[in-house]
Amino acid sequence: MFRKAIFFFLMFCTFSLQSQNLQLHFDPRSSIHGKESFQSDYMTATFEMFKPDQWGSTFMFVDIDFNLSKGNAGMIYAEFSRKFNINDFPLMPLIEYNGGLGVFEVDDNDVGGGYSIPNAYLVGISYPFQLGNVFMDTYVAYKYNAFKETSHDVQWTVIWTGNFASDKLTVCGFADLWTENKSQMNANSEKKVIFLSEPQVWYNATSNFSLGSEVKISSNFIQNSEVYICPTLAVKWNF
């Protein structure tokens, strides 16, 4: 019975994402929070791919932020995860990789240098379930943050997706809560707790084209302990 539930969960996710999609978001965070917090508003392109198979499922996404002058790309970030079925066992082992690269500009809009978003490697256990029309997944994982001085941490994630109004409305997103060292240079640094959530709402104009919004909610995430709420305007193409 549980394998049947897993099957329908995977099939639902496949239908919702139609294997893969491309999103384009306008992020007005500088207009909302001011240039003291964010230098500019910018566009973000997101590619998502979900692929289930008889052994489990693979999910990945890639974000590209066009946050440099003249709309040039300034950062790329990616996550890849794999979950595994174990017969009728209700939990699914999970592995995940996160990481990225970026560049920054100096005052004359020339590229001033580059930076790396430190790799993170996760190993944990996932539990998929259903609440009404909403299919959900939650996992707890050990997180290895590859800072200059390694940070050993834990992450809890909740993921949701559901269709309503005869599939014209899709609600989806995730919420992450994790720990990491306050200082990436000190292995004995105190820990901080970070929260990040990105709920999305989509109006599905056709089976391929959607209009919607994502609200980026973060606490203790962007170089300080402040809470930021950054809504976007977005379009999505499923293919």
Report residues per predicted region.
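Bacterial Sec-dependent N-terminal signal peptides
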Residues: 1-21
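Short glycine/proline- and aromatic-enriched beta-strand/turn motifs that initiate or cap beta-hairpins
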Residues: 17-68
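Outer-membrane pore/translocation modules
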Residues: 21-27, 37-41, 71-159, 188-189, ...
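Transmembrane beta-strands of outer-membrane beta-barrel pores
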Residues: 26-30, 53, 64-68, 97-103, ...
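Transmembrane beta-barrel domains of outer membrane proteins
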Residues: 50-52, 81-83, 126-130, 159-163, ...
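Repeated loop/turn-to-beta-strand initiation elements of outer-membrane beta-barrel proteins
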Residues: 55-60, 86-93, 131-138, 164-172, ...
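Outer-membrane beta-barrel transmembrane domain signature
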Residues: 141-210, 216-219, 237-239
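Outer-membrane beta-barrel "beta-signal"
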Residues: 228-239
